[in-house]
A protein has these predicted regions:
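Conserved AdoMet
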Residues: 1-28, 146, 162
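Hydrophobic/aromatic residues located in beta-strands of well-ordered beta-sheets
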Residues: 27, 54-56, 159
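Conserved S-adenosyl-L-methionine
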Residues: 31
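Conserved SAM-binding loop of SAM-dependent methyltransferases across substrates and taxa
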Residues: 36-48
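A short glycine-rich, Lys/Arg-flanked "PGG" loop and its adjoining helix->strand segment in the class I
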Residues: 146-155
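Conserved beta-strand signature within the Rossmann-like core of class I S-adenosyl-L-methionine
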Residues: 156-163
Length: 184
């Protein structure tokens, strides 16, 4: 979803973070659901840095979706939006309609159970990806989560959210707004 945002991540944000912090970025995919996002992130990072340097922490509160994420098996609808190069390089066909993600990519992602409203957050993160979940939170809960994300990030780190999410009062929690532009 949102190819323009992923393009901005790949072409602008990641090169900036790598130039500031080196190839071993600490990346957290919060509310990762079935793992589509952290695995996609690992594939994008693999274009920029050696795979051995990629370590993504991926959290969700639902143990069942985390088990699905760890399995790394997806239907063709889940992978059809990925670039062909990623489909060919990182997926193995299983039967007629399913694809298994490569072990190389699976090794880049560590899945853990975590509740954004209750559990401690990782610290020292260079990049936090949290898309399309906070829209379901109350304004008070969003404010709390954004403040905790800010404390989890290193100075000049990046919080990457979905284009449906607005951080009201982002300056109050020391965020600088970067907008991804639609590309044709």
């Amino acid at each position: 979803r949102n190819p323009n945002l992923w393009k901005t991540l790949e072409d602008v944000i990641l090169p900036d973070l790598i130039s500031k912090f080196g190839p071993r970025l600490k990346v957290w995919s919060a509310a990762c659901s079935t793992g589509d996002e952290p695995y996609s992130l690992a594939m994008v990072l693999a274009k920029k840095v050696p795979m051995r340097d990629i370590k993504i922490i991926a959290t969700d509160l639902d143990e069942q979706v985390l088990e699905k994420a760890k399995d790394g098996v997806y239907g063709e609808n889940s992978i059809k939006g990925l670039p062909k190069e990623f489909q060919d390089k990182y997926f193995e066909k299983m039967g007629d309609r399913f694809y298994k993600i490569s072990d190389d990519i699976k090794r880049c992602v560590e899945f853990k159970k975590s509740n954004l409203l209750k559990d401690p957050y990782p610290t020292g993160c260079h990049l936090i990806v949290c898309r399309n979940v906070l829209i379901y939170f109350t304004e008070e809960a969003k404010k709390d989560v954004y403040e905790k994300f800010n404390k989890s990030l290193v100075t000049d780190g990046c919080l990457f959210v979905g284009n449906t999410e607005q951080i009201i009062g982002y300056r109050a929690v020391s965020y600088t707004h970067l907008r991804a532009h639609e590309t044709t």
